[in-house]
Amino acid sequence: MATALALALPVSAFWLTGCGKGASGDASHETNGTAKLVVVTTTTHVTDMVESVAGKRVEVIALMGPGVDPHLYKPSAKDVTALSKATLVFYSGLMLEGRMAEVFSKASLKGTKTYAVTKNVPEEKLLHPEEFAGHPDPHVWFDPEIWMNCIEVVRAGLTEADPAGKDEYARNAEALKVEYGAVTNWAKT
């Protein structure tokens, strides 16, 4: 027992000191002397897209994990703190994260760039079911051909915030479009 305790204390101290914010107290991390952008995302599908386009140039903080219903999600105090420290926020849009609209608006007013990734989806591609009370169906990621329109919003937002990463973001965005195109072609066969 004493040996296990003697081993547990230094291991715990190691893990505790290795977690959390940097000495400056902000949420950014440095790589090769350059601070990474802090990007907050909402849903897992938006997180996956942002991580694919951004590569290792940014730190992505996902607010919602797998199985979370974005329609009902209420941001916690931790989420609001993450949003306040973010350089960029990417969310799905089309009222998918309906309860977070006010939080996005406040973040935007404080200078954080916020992007609804669905803003480039052509209106004629959106479904308008009767039960959605005049709003489009926000579940556009189920169609990779439609969801592909969102990649450009992510690439443009990242490039605006980090012009030095322009080429990498463009390469990664094109590679992701090829992947989505392959899925679309597979689904049509």
State where each predicted segment sits:
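Extracytoplasmic metal-acquisition and chelation regions
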Residues: 15-189
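Bacterial N-terminal signal peptides
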Residues: 3-15
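Residue-level detector of alpha-helical transmembrane segments in integral membrane proteins
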Residues: 2-3, 137
